[in-house]
Structure formats: C-alpha cells, structure tokens
A protein has these predicted regions:
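A short acidic/glycine-rich loop-to-helix N-cap element
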Residues: 109-113
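Amphipathic alpha-helical recognition patches that constitute DNA-binding helices
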Residues: 6, 43, 82
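Active-site-adjacent beta-strand/loop module that shapes the phosphate/pyrophosphate-binding cleft
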Residues: 3, 13, 69-108, 118-135
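Conserved Nudix-box catalytic region and its N-terminal flanking loop in Nudix hydrolases
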Residues: 16-54
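Short aromatic-enriched loop/helix-cap "lid" or pocket-rim segments at secondary-structure transitions
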Residues: 31-32, 79, 115
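Conserved N-terminal beta-strand and adjoining loop/helix that marks the start
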Residues: 1-18, 34
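A short coil-to-beta-strand element that immediately follows conserved catalytic motifs
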Residues: 59-69
Length: 139
C-alpha cells in the first residue's frame, strides 16, 4: 500500500490554515494541504515534519504535530495519514514548488472547484474543528 501524509497547519490565532496551490495534475491550480509520500521504512510523524520543513520551512520548533486520522482507499492501495498543528509563533514561509497561501478557516473547504480531494479537505478540517472544540480550543 502506498502511504502519503497531509498536514493541516493553523496560524497561532486559529483564523487561517495553510494551503498550497498545486502545479501538477491531478488538481492542477487547486488548493491542497501540504504533504507528500511516506517512505516505507520511515516513521510517519518524522515524515510529516520532513515534508512540512521541505515545502514550507516550518519545523518542529514552530509547531507540534498531532497524528489525527487515516484515510484509506483500499481498492486503490493508498493510505493517507492526517496530521494537524497550531503554530506557536509567526513564521516566514519558504515555498519549495507550490505557492503557499493562508486561507480563512471559515472558507468552504468542500468547494470542489477550489479545493482538491473531492471534499476530503472539508471533511478533515471539520473533524479537526470538532476535536479542537472538544479540547475547548475555539476556532
């Protein structure tokens, strides 16, 4: 099974989340979460931090990531590990390939004309909002 990760990054004030604008198909020109492939022998959390550092310049001193959920596409042989975190300070983003953009947390992440993944980004962010509200962290 091929493994991937996606990372939901919230600004410290929780008003915006970080998106990248895809430059390749599938979903070319659409917003997506930061993430990438997980090497088979590597730990998922370490791979999430590695991808985040490579694609944004955000590192473990800037954010603590939480392993939140998996999405599995059994017939496609694909598994996606979902992580999230809240920045503990303002950061200077450095784009690797894809343009990075902060998006208002109240945007419609289910908009399939704007966001990649057939509504998965909306589902992921709504589930994280529930988790944060359960921890008395209000968005």
């Amino acid at each position: 099974m091929k493994k991937y990760n996606v990372i939901v990054v919230f600004e410290k004030d929780l008003n915006r989340t970080l998106m990248c604008k895809r430059t390749k198909e599938p979903y070319k020109g659409m917003f997506n979460l930061v993430g990438g492939k997980i090497d088979k022998e590597n730990d998922g959390l370490n791979e999430a931090y590695r991808e985040l550092q490579e694609e944004t310049n955000i590192n473990c001193d800037d954010i603590s990531l939480i392993y939140f959920m998996n999405i599995e596409y059994v017939t496609m042989g694909k598994s996606i590990e979902v992580y999230y975190g809240i920045l503990n300070k303002d950061v200077c983003l450095v784009e690797e390939v894809n343009k990075l953009e902060w998006v208002d947390i109240n945007d419609n992440f289910f908009d399939m004309n704007k966001y990649a993944g057939e509504g998965n980004i909306g589902h992921i962010i709504e589930e994280i909002k529930i988790e944060l509200n359960n921890k008395n962290i209000n968005l």
